[in-house]
């Protein structure tokens, strides 16, 4: 009811900040359809911003995919810039063509705390993300029985653009943090030049549908010490 965009506040998901015996707090995330058991990267950044507003000053927490920590880099004009440590990525699976979808789909599968399929395309701005994303999410036999979020990626000079169809929301969202991480790791593995590279770390700037985010990681064993950075702002109470 809270997530309903007609009769509630309107949101892609609901997060609960709960007490933890091990860390500063625990984050429980639920999609707008009530499903849970996965990590939400942008939700994690928003949870840290919320925790800070509640007076919490240290941000080690537990989520569905394990331990996370975060830093607030800036807090200006009601917008917090949050840097969140994400799960390491130990495996990437490449597919020349998924079986089942009506459109042939070459891409990569990764788990960044949530299951993601990444597909590189041209003309992303006008791409039918919902139709093709839904087709892959429900019909790709390789991703069954659980399915996966589907990310469409287009490199540009200086970074990548990402649009995501999210399962559980069953629509395109303005930005998906775990999907953006998956897209950046896939971009590196596919030879897409990063925005910067220094001391063994690579960094990608990412244009989502609304915000500019960044992902940096060490490209060892696919991706280690992965961090997601972006804005989080208060909307309603």
Kindly label every feature range from the protein language model.
Residues 1-78, 118-237:
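A glycine-rich beta-to-alpha transition motif near the start of alpha/beta enzyme domains, typified by
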Residues 90-93, 97-112, 117, 223-237:
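C-terminal domain-closing interface element
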Residues 64-66, 87, 99-104, 209-211:
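Short strand-coil-strand connectors
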């Amino acid at each position: 009811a809270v997530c309903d965009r007609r009769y509630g506040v309107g949101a892609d998901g609901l997060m609960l900040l709960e007490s933890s015996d091990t860390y500063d707090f625990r984050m429980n995330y639920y999609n707008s359809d009530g499903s849970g058991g996965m990590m939400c990267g942008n939700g994690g950044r928003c949870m840290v911003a919320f925790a800070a507003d509640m007076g919490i000053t240290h941000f080690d927490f537990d989520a569905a995919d394990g331990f996370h920590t975060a830093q607030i880099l800036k807090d200006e004009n009601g917008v917090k810039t949050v840097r969140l440590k994400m799960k390491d990525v130990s495996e990437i699976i490449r597919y020349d063509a998924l079986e089942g979808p009506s459109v042939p789909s070459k891409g990569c599968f990764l788990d960044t705390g949530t299951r993601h399929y990444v597909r590189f395309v041209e003309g992303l701005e006008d791409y039918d993300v919902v139709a093709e994303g839904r087709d892959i999410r429900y019909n790709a036999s390789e991703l069954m029985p659980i399915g996966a979020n589907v990310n469409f990626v287009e490199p540009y000079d200086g970074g990548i653009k990402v649009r995501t169809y999210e399962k559980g929301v069953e629509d395109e969202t303005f930005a998906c943090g775990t999907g953006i991480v998956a897209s950046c790791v896939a971009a590196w593995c596919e030879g897409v030049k990063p925005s910067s590279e220094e001391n063994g770390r690579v960094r990608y700037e990412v244009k989502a549908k609304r915000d500019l985010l960044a992902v940096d990681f060490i490209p060892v064993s696919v991706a280690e010490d992965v961090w997601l950075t972006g804005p989080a702002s208060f909307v309603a109470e």
